[in-house]
Amino acid sequence: MRVVPLLVLLLLFLASLGGVLSAFGDGFLGRYYVDAWGTQWFYWFTQHTVLQDTVSQTAMFFYPWGKDVYGHTGGNVLDGVLAAPFRAALGPALGYNVFVVLIFLTNVWGMRRLLGEFAVSSWAAWLTGALFAFNPFLLTELRDGRPTQAILVFALLFWTYWVRAAQGWRPVVLAGVFLALTGLMYWYYAILAAPAALAVTALDRAPGALRNRVAAGALAAVLVLPFALGMLTSDAVPGLFDTTLWSATTWSPMTLDGMPVGILAFDPLRRMSGFWVEDPDGTRIFTPEWVSMLRIQVVLAAAGLWYASPRLRRVGLCILVPSLLVALGPEWMGIPNTPYLLAVKFVRVLQRLWWPARALVFFHVGLAILAAPLWDGLVRWPRTRSVLAFGAAVAWLVDLKVATLAPLPMWSARIPNVYECLAKDTDRAPVFELPYAYTQAHLYYQTVHEHPIFGGMIEDNKIFTPVPQQAMRTDNTFVKGLIDLADAKYPDKEITTEDKNAMRDLGYRWVVLDKMPYQNPPAFPEARPRTNYPEVRTELEKYLGEPVYEDFSGVIWAPWGGSSPCADEEEAEPARPLLRRRDRSRGNL
């Protein structure tokens, strides 16, 4: 690796991460967001459960019924396994952040390895890899807490050996292995690679090219079959599109469950990804959300085409164009995307693809491949080449800054004090949390306190919730009554002692009320304000008794008897007053 590419990589790294290096062990890279909380839960679960007993069924949420965690989320666990040694050695926060740095570096190396297939110089390959690793798609995934979708080293190695598959059986085997690893990392990346892989194959006239690539695909299928068989044979896949409403020119965001979903798509003219949503009157609107392509990327790729060899140009376009076509989603500028619409209608695995814009991952691979020859084309003017390299990096960073993708934020690893108190209970007795389904941040809290909880992942969606748990929420007057009271509504039925004891018989000991929902404004931007905490607290005490612990962050009750879980700790600080507003209409407190 030469000096200029190394300095460009260092510049990109410091501009994206330098501001948080001093606090690398105090928080997690990314924003305080639902996917980030879920990722930390999965990494914790993988480290402490799956790696010990290889069981994916857990009763840590939706206790005591539990959930098949990987059936619930698609079975992708490889990133959790890879992150486990870092968490074990360095702790959850520092271990995760070091793992993210490794993601950046392996993506740089993977792109450099792929470009080596096209006789691109080491200088140009390292520089292109450095820029590629900080593209807006990957930064968005890391910012929002989805490292699974940012780990591309296996996909890049797959493309490396897929390109040369006609050259013998070794690249065939390696292409199959790395395609399998790509799928195990994130199933949809293996699926989204298919259109581009078919295009590369169709335009490769080398003897044995088709035969060898069919063999590589078959090997990948065999390798992932033990992990995918359960999903392939299951009739209970939630969230499938109702494809009776789809045709070559029409589509609908409705699922078979009758739930409308937002479809994540890409608008190349705006350079933004966003969601197709449907208003109640049936009007469909595209709502741009974040930048997914930089202007400088297009400039570099267009300039690189001038210097590209026919083989590099062919492969780059074969990866870029089909990926862009998928990423457009169901329509663009009012024009139906017929290939995509028909693929979703007739290919079952695509009927759960709510996010076609994730095909942009390979669109960016294509852009990088096409841009790389530019730097070799300038080799006769080394000083000019170096100046342009730094200029491109600066333009890259300016665009990232404008798009609010650099620098990456960091969120604190600390959990509310009330949950820190709960963590002192070494019996790990189950907990009933209120308000119910207020925030998925409680999944992250669980990685610290390690108690089973009544709610769980996507707990307000019946598709993802165990049927007995749903019945408990509607039929048990104690459970339903507490949920209503915490939501500032009077129960519609009298809470009975029998139903209260039914929760005790399931093993529950604690009821925790998080005070953050009652702040004004709410602690989480997406939350509905609840500003009548004093009334809520008073009504809950009628059924739960006096709290055993309270501080500014929350309240703990032991309604079936017991003392504070942190009784040996120093006395909790006094509760802070919260704004109150009474609204007794429609049964509200």
Q: What are these language model-derived features?
A:
Residues 1-22, 215-219, 306-316, 387-389, ...:
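Start-transfer (signal-anchor) and selected internal transmembrane alpha helices
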Residues 9, 99-118, 123-204, 217-220, ...:
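Membrane-embedded helix bundles of polyisoprenyl
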Residues 20-118, 123-156, 280-282:
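Active-site lumenal/periplasmic loops and adjacent helix-entry segments of GT-C-fold
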Residues 29-32, 138-149, 249, 285, ...:
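Membrane-helix boundary/interfacial segments in multi-pass membrane proteins
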Residues 33-49, 225-305, 348, 356:
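Periplasmic/ER-lumenal interhelical loops and adjacent helix-loop junctions
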Residues 198, 214-222, 369-401:
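Signature aromatic-anchored transmembrane alpha helix within multi-pass, membrane-resident enzymes
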Residues 202, 219-222, 293-326, 374-377:
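Hydrophobic, aromatic-rich transmembrane alpha-helices
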Residues 243-252, 287, 394-589:
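Extracytoplasmic
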